[in-house]
From Swiss-Prot:
Gene name as annotated: glmU
Keyword terms of this UniProt record: Acyltransferase, Cell shape, Cell wall biogenesis/degradation, Cytoplasm, Magnesium, Metal-binding, Multifunctional enzyme, Nucleotidyltransferase, Peptidoglycan synthesis, Repeat, Transferase
Stretches for region Pyrophosphorylase: 1-230
Stretches the record annotates as N-acetyltransferase: 252-457
Protein name in UniProt: Bifunctional protein GlmU
Residues engaged in binding Mg(2+): D103, N228
High-level lineage: Bacteria, Bacillati, Bacillota, Bacilli, Bacillales
């Protein structure tokens, strides 16, 4: 097999995005669009990937570190000029080079592999990836002769009326013989209205030299969708989301309403899990088998075990074991570690908290910087008071502890195994094993005093 190279064009400014964020870094289903492109290329056994960067180069390099080499295009003088920046990296090498736009996040590895195969079969010096669309307005047209052989690419503004009726378009993805590409690039002119060097001109140069130029037509236009504004970004996200959701459903996940379910590309979901409408699963979240996630839930970069029921709750950068009940309206903040058979009820918030197996936090509870043992029951309104206005401190609760309602545990504090905290207590000292901790003012009833308060008839 000949050597394979790839050049990813990612230097455009993207002014139509009207954004401070560099265009190719806009996310599509949880990943910058240029990273979608590079990740697909990486599955093709490519020997070298070179990404052409320009505006926001440092940020692009951060996202693609370890996945690509980089060359900077100091001035944006057209697509041919951009590819020419890789001359020092690739010129003179035997093999084939893919050229792909970094703003086409829907392009798939299987399509690029088919393009490479077709290029090899046709013994071509250049092969254009094309597709057919109903309305080709604005796209370059593929002009073929009577035998179906590619003659040239004509830009829409330069096309005759007859040529404008052609529906086969240039997608902007190419496969070239590497040596032929860089030799032809040296002869591309900027003699045009924009004063730029255009990559399609390489096709004409090769044809004029009687080299074989082919065109591989793909079925799906959506893979070639380029993102130049927020409207196209939304469309690319919609199409990518459909692809992701259909893949999960084929693998045994029930999405009650896939059109209103938002799942990032790196999320993994087990079989027989049910995801209700309005759920957002972000980042590298992993959800096990037989779970239910109800409407309005958001789970980000978290690992969820099996048979977990998440009811309209938020989980961020946390770990949840098996057979856990969460919500409704619970909030697991980063570094929460919820063990098996735990109940996290409504309006419960945890942060940097370990919750032991079988423990119940039923409702209206805050546990931050806490370590809670097994089979603990924490009553409504209880708080691990972890912040003194300057420093955070830790609360440790042993196994088989009962914490009564409206208890304040003032950290740093430790409650021993099998201890009992009386309701309404403010605990400031450690409570030994098997002890009752009670810290509240003694009740004093003032007989007849209420008559003087005039609070009622």
């Amino acid at each position: 097999m000949s050597k394979r190279y790839a050049v990813v064009l990612a230097a455009g400014q993207g002014t139509r995005m009207k954004s401070k964020l560099y265009k190719v870094l806009h996310p599509v289903c949880g990943k910058p669009m240029v990273e979608h492109v590079v990740d697909q290329i990486s599955t093709l056994n490519v020997d070298k990937v070179v990404t052409i960067v320009g505006h926001g180069a440092e940020k692009v390099q951060e996202h693609l570190a370890g996945k690509s080499e980089f060359v900077k295009q100091e001035e944006q003088l057209g697509t041919a000029h951009a590819v020419l920046q890789a001359k020092a990296e690739l010129a003179g090498k035997d093999g084939v080079t893919l050229v792909v736009c970094g703003d086409t996040p829907l392009i798939e590895a299987s399509t690029m592999e088919a393009l490479l195969k077709y290029h090899h079969e046709k013994r071509a010096k250049a092969t254009i990836l094309t597709t057919v669309i109903e309305d080709p307005t604005g796209y370059g047209r593929i002009i073929r002769d009577d035998l179906g052989i590619v003659e040239k690419i004509v830009e829409h503004k330069d096309a005759t009326e007859k040529e404008q009726r052609i529906s086969e378009i240039n997608t902007g993805t190419y496969c070239f013989d590497n040596k032929a590409l860089f030799e032809a690039l040296e002869n591309v002119s900027n003699d045009n209205v924009q004063g730029e060097y255009y990559l399609p001109d390489v096709i004409k140069i090769l044809k004029d030299s009687d080299e074989v130029v082919a065109a591989y037509r793909m079925e799906s236009f959506e893979e070639s969708l380029g993102v130049n504004d927020r409207i196209a970004l939304a469309e690319a996200s919609r199409l990518m989301q459909r692809r992701i959701n259909e893949n999960h459903m084929r693998n045994g996940v029930t999405l009650v309403n896939p059109e209103n379910t938002y799942i990032d590309i790196d999320v993994k979901i087990g079989q027989d899990t049910v995801i209700e409408p309005g759920v957002m699963l972000r980042g590298e979240t992993v959800i096990g088998d037989d779970c239910v996630v109800t409407s309005g839930s958001e789970i980000v970069n978290s690992v969820i075990g099996e048979r977990v029921h998440v009811k309209t709750s938020s989980i961020f950068e946390s770990k949840v074991g098996d057979d856990v009940q969460i919500g409704p309206y619970a909030h697991l903040r980063p570094e929460s570690d919820i063990h098996d058979h735990v109940k996290i009820g409504n309006y419960v918030e945890t942060k940097k908290a370990v919750v032991g197996e079988g423990t119940k936090l039923p409702h209206f509870i805050y546990m931050g910087d806490a370590e809670i043992g097994k089979n603990v029951n924490v009553g409504c309104g209880s708080i691990a008071v972890n912040y003194d206005g300057k420093n955070k401190a830790k609360t440790i609760i042993g196994d088989n502890v009962f914490v009564g309602c409206n208890s304040n545990l003032i950290a740093p504090v430790k409650v021993g195994d099998r201890a009992f905290i009386a309701a309404g207590s403010t605990i400031t000292k450690d409570v030994p094993d098997d002890a009752l901790g009670i810290a509240r003012a003694k009740q004093d009833n003032k007989l007849g005093y209420a008559k003087h308060l005039n609070h009622g008839k």
